[in-house]
């Protein structure tokens, strides 16, 4: 009886850590995109960069402002399905939380460029993005996209 209570408490702590890391990483990622990446006109690797590139193409050539969340969720739909099928339900659900939350925050947070120096933006944007990915992996979740493929 006492062992079962301890296991439930440990599981609760583990889930709190998982979702705490997910929320923190999603928030920092959105801030990074709005303060560094977009300010420098950069397109990082992975689905984040592809999402920003598609947004830019829609805006430039068609005059349509497509939300970041919409493109990012559509791009991540296939890796999410693969994650559900082959990696695990808990991991995939927490990763979907990161994908959706970072997308929504990227759409909501106003753009606040810190600097326009491309070298500084590249260095700090990359460091912050790497920190967010590490934070997700520590919490046993991912930022979606190519992370699903790499883990599978």
What are the residue ranges of the model-derived segments?
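Core subunits and conserved enzymes of cellular information-processing
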Residues: 2-152
């Amino acid at each position: 009886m006492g062992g079962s209570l301890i296991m439930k408490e440990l599981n609760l702590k583990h889930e709190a850590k998982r979702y705490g890391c997910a929320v923190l990483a999603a928030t920092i990622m959105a801030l990074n995109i709005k303060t560094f990446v977009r300010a420098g006109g950069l397109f990082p690797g992975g689905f984040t960069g592809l999402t920003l590139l598609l947004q830019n193409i829609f805006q430039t050539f068609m005059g349509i402002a497509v939300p970041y969340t919409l493109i990012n969720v559509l791009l991540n739909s296939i890796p999410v399905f693969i994650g559900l099928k082959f990696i695990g339900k808990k991991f995939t659900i927490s990763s979907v939380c990161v994908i959706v939350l970072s997308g929504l925050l990227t759409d909501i947070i106003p753009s606040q460029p810190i600097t326009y120096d491309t070298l500084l933006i590249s260095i700090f944007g990359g460091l912050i993005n790497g920190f967010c990915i590490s934070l997700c992996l520590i919490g046993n979740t991912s930022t979606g996209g190519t992370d699903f493929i790499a883990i599978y």
